[in-house]
Amino acid sequence: MSNPWDIVILGCGQLGGNLKTALEAEKIHVLGVRRTPVPDDSTFISLDLDVADAWEQLAQVPLAPNAVIVAIMTPDARTEDAYRQRYVGVSERLRQFVSAPGREHAVIWVSSTAVFGQHQSGVLDESVPAEPDHWRGYCLREAEQNIEQIQAATVIRLTGLYNAQSLKRLQDPEFRAQLDSKVVSNRIHREDAVSWLNALACNYLQKIPVPSLIHGVDMGSARYQEIYDFVDGVSSAIKPATVGRIVNSRYRDRMPALQYPTCEVVINSP
């Protein structure tokens, strides 16, 4: 029998793969679960979590008693049916999975701040109830509610993930035309998102108290126009947003310091 897994990452794509690498660097035994097979790598298994049989196969995988399950779901399409199948369906199956005797594992569920309704503005931290007003938000919130029924669980709502390459798109006039320049951009660098997920997983492994809800966001919420002006050299700094939809977290002091507290740091990098 193989050694039991310390952490299982359900939906081990780009973000999950980066998390897996970070955890393995700390000598943690990590299993990645994804639909697409990874040849010649026994630390991955191929399962379609939309199918009930996949969960029966997962139940046969040896897990450590304190194993942590991290779920990073991505829908196949930007439609209500696709979101409902992937987020609501998988969260319900995951809830059932960890409610079975002997499988009371901690769960980290990656959600999105898109759960907030478009009418919600001001500072939106973890104390503000989400009031979805669109099918996407409804599906995200329903999935969160499934996870909230798990005894040991954290929902982390990520804002827009970015890196240096994706920021370059902001120089493209056609890309800018797709965005409302007056809207506030709430983001977190991909490396910081991985760092926070890593910390949450390790805290659960070490029995360190973890918030049940946390927002993954940097400290640089700003209107797109302010970012454009900085990118174009019109301004010397990005002015933080004071009105509009400003996502924040009450738990920054319990998480690793951000390597990229604002996108200015990335834009100014060589």
Located regions from the model:
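Substrate-positioning beta->alpha
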Residues: V155-L158, S166-K168, A177-C202
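NAD(P)-cofactor binding segment of oxidoreductase domains
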Residues: N66-I108, E142
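N-terminal Rossmann-fold NAD(P) dinucleotide-binding loop
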Residues: G16-G17
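C-terminal amphipathic/interface module of NAD(P)-dependent oxidoreductases
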Residues: S236-P270
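Conserved beta-loop-beta element that borders a ligand/cofactor-binding pocket
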Residues: S112, Q145-A164
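Conserved Rossmann-fold cofactor-binding substructure of NAD(P)-dependent oxidoreductases
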Residues: T43-P65
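Mid/C-terminal beta-alpha module of Rossmann-like enzyme folds, strongest
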Residues: V194-G244
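Conserved Rossmann-fold NAD(P)-dependent oxidoreductase catalytic core, especially the SDR/UDP-sugar
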Residues: R95-D133
